[in-house]
């Protein structure tokens, strides 16, 4: 391979596939808390999930994630393992547990540079388990993605009342009766 091909390969970030020895994941436990999401946030009306990653009763990290309201995808907002516990497979083991609990594609939300290697390994491992990690979702793409379940978002009562009022005004006007603002 000549120098130009090597440079192109690096520019495209097409690293040669590395052979990784198959090793079992460490035993971890997830302690999960479910919290409601606020209206007009990404996963609303589905709850947000926050899991502590435990190893022999010690907290080694956490995962912040959520299942979308359609139930067809898990979004991983953040996975963090304390520095002294990194590179032991705890984060990967936590993702494997989440993937087993929710057999739907998993989507990382905005992968930071330092996590690219982790997600590459996670993608390979979960694919071997028959699970899929989709391309990351950037912050600028969240609103567009959330449109897929907007039909499930309950309409606030004040907005419903305003909408119904204007429907009534239009029906009254169509019937030739005065209605709406400014009627005396």
List each language-model region with its residue ranges.
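Terminal substrate-recognition subdomain of acyl/acetyltransferases
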Residues: 2-27, 35-69, 73, 104-184
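Conserved acetyl-CoA-binding loop-helix of GNAT-fold acetyltransferases
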Residues: 81, 87-100
């Amino acid at each position: 391979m000549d120098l130009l091909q090597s440079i192109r390969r690096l520019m495209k970030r097409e690293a040669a596939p590395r052979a990784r020895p198959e090793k079992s994941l460490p035993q971890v436990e997830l302690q999960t808390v479910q919290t409601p999401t606020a209206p007009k946030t990404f996963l609303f009306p589905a709850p947000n999930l926050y899991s502590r990653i435990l190893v022999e009763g010690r907290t080694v990290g956490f995962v912040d994630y959520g299942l979308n309201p359609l139930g067809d995808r898990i979004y991983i907002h953040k996975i963090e393992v304390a520095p002294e516990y990194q590179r032991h497979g705890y984060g990967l083991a936590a993702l494997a547990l989440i993937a087993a609990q929710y057999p739907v594609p998993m989507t990382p939300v905005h992968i930071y540079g330092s996590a690219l290697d982790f997600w590459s390994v996670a993608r390979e491992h979960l694919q071997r388990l028959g699970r899929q990690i989709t391309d990351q979702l950037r912050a600028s793409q969240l609103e567009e993605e959330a449109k897929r379940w907007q039909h499930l978002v309950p309409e606030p009562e004040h907005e419903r009342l305003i909408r119904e009022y204007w429907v009534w005004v239009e029906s009254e006007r169509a019937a030739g009766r005065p209605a709406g603002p400014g009627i005396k």
